[in-house]
Amino acid sequence: MAKNKDIFQLGGKAYRVYPLKAPWGQVRLILKVESYLDGTLAVMAFDVSGRHPEEYAVLTVNLCNPLQDEEKAFFDTNNCGYLYGQLRQAGVIHPLPVSARSGFCTYPLCEWDKTKFVPEQER
């Protein structure tokens, strides 16, 4: 881990650390760009509070919607709704006036600012 508590090194790459509130306490998350099999954006969160990073959650859901692409994805408000407002306030997500239903849940489409996943000096 880097000496700066706001930066975490993983696989030779620097990631910005977001101290966020979960229902059970504080977590320190980094966000990583991945993709679904159809090539659309998937965002993984890893908890770096401990000695080793642990997979925390997939923050997006793949609804096979034509509005999804490499920049826009539906936020998983069903499992990670408590992070939605915090990431919005941090400027990581920008909600769009579109949502989609799956089962009993409605998911907002967001534009993800992937530049916020890395420290400012790495952009």
Question: Which residues are covered by each model-predicted region?
Answer:
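Catalytic phosphate/metal-binding cores of nucleic-acid and nucleotide-processing enzymes, i.e., regions
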Residues: 10-15, 19-24, 28-58, 66
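Short, compact, well-ordered microdomains
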Residues: 76-122
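Intrinsic disorder/low-complexity detector
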Residues: 6-8, 67, 78, 115
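A generic structural micro-environment signature
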Residues: 26, 67-69, 99, 118
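Low-complexity, intrinsically disordered extramembrane tails and loops of integral membrane proteins
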Residues: 2, 122-123
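Elongated scaffolding segments in large macromolecular assemblies
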Residues: 2-5, 12
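Acidic, aromatic-enriched beta-alpha/helix-loop junctions
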Residues: 44-92
